[in-house]
């Protein structure tokens, strides 16, 4: 039985590289990314159904990505403030909330931005937990599995989104779940309703991720100081040859 010490923290024993915790992380990541990409297709379809101006469609992705940029200096602090499985649970719950807001009256762009906040908070947790769960020599392989699974989920998610907005599939969802009773009558809304369940399932899987036992010193929330530290770290990475490769 092997033990790993990373960043001063001793992880629990694990018998092999593919332990239960890593399988759970992969499953949660796949489901969350699958829903992210299916939602993009469904949200575009919703804008089309609502006869929104053409300029709104490209803004969907912008509203999603802007959270990564605006919150980059602080999401890492949030991810280290509690067990990362819980962080991922909160993040997926926030994504599900964004979907529900999109269904029940909120502007699609604003609702999609909330989904983006959840995605931005999710990223540092999904990568950070690997350093707590696995030994350093296994991290490259682990990240390869995560990235490969993410690529697969992107392809399948876009496909799933296209399937869910089909009239026969979406119409079936509207009928089976009696969505008209709660004011949901559009095919795109039925698709988003189904995606809420995927996010919910991903959040439930997050709860099954084992607590690695890693605890970090509590950091006071100082937005300006955190922004300065983030900027300095960013410059440091750009000056490092390997860091340049990673960022580019």
Residue ranges, per PLM feature:
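Substrate-agnostic recognition of the 12-TM MFS/MFS-like secondary transporter fold
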Residues: 21-40, 60-79, 83-95, 111-166, ...
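A helix-boundary/kink motif common to multi-pass secondary transporters
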Residues: 52-53, 83-84, 135, 169, ...
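Juxtamembrane helix-start elements in MFS-like secondary transporters
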Residues: 53-61
């Amino acid at each position: 039985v092997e033990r790993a010490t990373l960043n001063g923290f001793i992880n629990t024993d694990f018998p092999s590289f593919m332990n239960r915790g890593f399988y759970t992380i992969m499953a949660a990541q796949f489901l969350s990314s699958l829903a992210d990409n299916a939602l993009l297709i469904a949200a575009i379809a919703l804008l089309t159904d609502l006869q929104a101006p053409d300029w709104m469609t490209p803004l969907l992705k912008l509203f999603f990505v802007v959270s990564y940029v605006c919150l980059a200096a602080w999401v890492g602090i949030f991810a280290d403030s509690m067990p990362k499985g819980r962080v991922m649970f909160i993040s997926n719950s926030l994504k599900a909330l964004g979907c529900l807001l999109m269904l029940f009256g909120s502007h699609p762009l604003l609702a999609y931005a909330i989904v983006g906040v959840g995605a931005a908070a999710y990223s540092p947790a999904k990568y950070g937990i690997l350093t707590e769960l696995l030994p350093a020599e296994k991290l490259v392989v682990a990240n390869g599995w995560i990235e490969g699974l993410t690529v697969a989920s992107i392809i399948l998610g876009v496909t799933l989104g296209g399937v869910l907005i089909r009239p026969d599939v979406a119409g079936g969802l509207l009928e089976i779940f009696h969505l008209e009773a709660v004011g949901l009558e559009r095919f795109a809304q039925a698709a988003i309703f189904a995606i809420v369940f995927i996010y919910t399932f991903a959040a439930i899987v997050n709860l099954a991720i084992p607590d690695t036992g890693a605890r970090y010193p509590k950091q006071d929330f100082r937005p300006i100081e955190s922004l300065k530290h983030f900027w300095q770290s960013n410059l440091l990475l750009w000056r490092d040859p390997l860091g340049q490769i990673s960022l580019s």
